[in-house]
């Protein structure tokens, strides 16, 4: 499992918990609101990093398309 920054781990945990609770993925706006961010640009950066590390996938043309690749995402924060 790739190393994650503390914030990446928090975002991944939030997405995972949201999907488990609601049976659908959060929007970028919902992620931003949860973390107190005024812009979704930062969320996009974190999501892209998680995608690059192979932990999530998303269809860039569809809303709420985030999917967890590995349900067991225990990793070391750096």
Predicted segments, located by residue:
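Short, cationic-aromatic polyanion-contact patches
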Residues: 5-8, 22, 27, 61-78
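Alpha-helical DNA-recognition elements
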Residues: 17, 48-49
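Helix-turn-helix DNA-binding helix
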Residues: 11, 42-43
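Short, basic interhelical loop/turn and adjoining N-cap
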Residues: 36-42
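Pre-recognition alpha-helix immediately N-terminal to the DNA-recognition helix
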Residues: 10-17
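A short alpha-helical element within helix-turn-helix/winged-helix DNA-binding domains
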Residues: 26-34
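Glycine-centered, phosphate/nucleic-acid-interacting loop/turn motifs that mediate DNA/RNA or nucleotide
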Residues: 54
């Amino acid at each position: 499992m790739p190393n994650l920054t503390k914030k990446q781990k928090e975002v991944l945990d939030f997405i995972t918990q949201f999907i488990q609770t609601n049976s659908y993925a959060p929007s970028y706006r919902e992620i931003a609101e949860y973390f107190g961010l005024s812009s979704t640009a930062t969320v996009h950066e974190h999501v892209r990093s998680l995608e690059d590390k192979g932990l999530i996938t998303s269809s860039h043309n569809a809303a709420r398309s985030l999917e967890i690749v590995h349900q067991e995402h225990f990793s070391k924060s750096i």
